């Protein structure tokens, strides 16, 4: 509602699904398709500039923002909070809700974030995050893999990392500044 109050046209989804709707699909695929369909709806609206669509989320929502930004080039600005990490960290300290067959042998999360380049990306992680979760030091390690891609594409100004004073949450002022600047 905060973004809507600021004048943005928003679609707010609740990504709480932890079981498959169809047996031959992956949970992440189903979640991502739902979000892509939201973008499909947005681009049909006369009030929406299709070149100025952003996405944002925290935790599982931050993961889904990562996936949507990576897989749908209509997203021009992605804000992913409480999720910049490594698969090793999540494997040891979190639920398996992020995992699907084969993902670990192919990529790490930094590789998926790299697919957003050269488009705009802001990642946020809280300095008061739980020690076993999405900590700033681990986020900085993942960022070391993302930054060179933005550099190679001459888009370093399109990559932001905000280690904020909070915990597992969105730093609202920096998110608003990011969208005000880029959308």
Regions found by a protein language model. Give the residues of each.
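Cap/lid segment of the alpha/beta-hydrolase catalytic domain
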Residues: 1-51, 87-93
């Amino acid at each position: 509602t905060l973004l809507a109050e600021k004048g943005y046209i928003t679609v707010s989804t609740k990504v709480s699904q932890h079981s498959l709707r169809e047996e031959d699909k992956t949970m992440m695929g189903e979640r991502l398709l739902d979000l892509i369909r939201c973008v499909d709806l947005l681009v049909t609206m006369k009030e929406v500039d299709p070149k100025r669509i952003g996405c944002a989320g925290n935790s599982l929502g931050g993961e889904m923002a990562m996936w949507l930004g990576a897989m749908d080039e209509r997203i021009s600005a992605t804000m992913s909070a409480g999720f910049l990490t490594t698969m090793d960290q999540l494997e040891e300290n979190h639920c398996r809700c992020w995992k699907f067959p084969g993902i670990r042998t192919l990529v790490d999360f930094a590789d998926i974030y790299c697919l957003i380049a050269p488009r705009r990306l802001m990642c946020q992680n809280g300095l008061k995050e739980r020690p076993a979760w999405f900590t700033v030091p681990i986020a900085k390690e993942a960022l070391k893999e993302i930054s060179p891609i933005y550099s190679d594409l001459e888009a370093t100004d399109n990559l932001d990392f905000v280690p904020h004073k909070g915990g597992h949450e969105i730093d609202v002022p920096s998110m608003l500044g990011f969208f005000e600047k880029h959308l």
